[in-house]
Amino acid sequence: KGKGLPPGAEEEMVAAGVPDWYIGSCKKIKYLFPKAHAVAYCMMAFRIAWFKVYHPLAFYAAYFYRRSQKGGFDAGLMTGGLESILANIDAIDNNADATAKDEDLLTTLEVVYEFYLRGFEFAPISVYESHATKFLIKDGKILPPFVAISGLGESAAWDLMEGRKGKNFLSIEEVSLACPKVSKTHMQMLKDAGAFGSLPDTSQV
């Protein structure tokens, strides 16, 4: 909100030949958006659009990373395919009691829907290949990070990356032993997400 002009300022501006539109603006708004700022916004929008067209996987990987930092990317919801995404979008659109969190989730769902429509796919989360926090590009697909699993925080995600170094696990049990910060609940989340592939629960024969 503008705070107007201090006493005498308008008279001084008129005397100095300042245009009426500028004086009027000073009375109404606190900040005048400069042309250079507007140009910078346009250039940034052009860069983003260029990446979206010519390097789409890099664009989506960066976008999903930013959304995940705010808890706006849930791998359980986002990696289920086109029909699943559309069903979740419809559920929020038709919910008269949708919360601000739901609306924020809807934004991500719509971009993921576009992602699928363009023929792209997510690679399954992998205990060996997923990053703790970054979305990676792998074999023409996007590989979600560990934190994309709802309820699995950064501490556990980084512990997974550290614990797997130089390892060739024989079982899910071995993963658990190598990653002490990853709780049993987290391990079940990873298992449900398919992160362990064909690893058996234990190393016992």
State each model region's role.
Residues 1-205:
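Noncatalytic, beta-rich nucleic-acid-contacting surfaces in large DNA/RNA-processing enzymes
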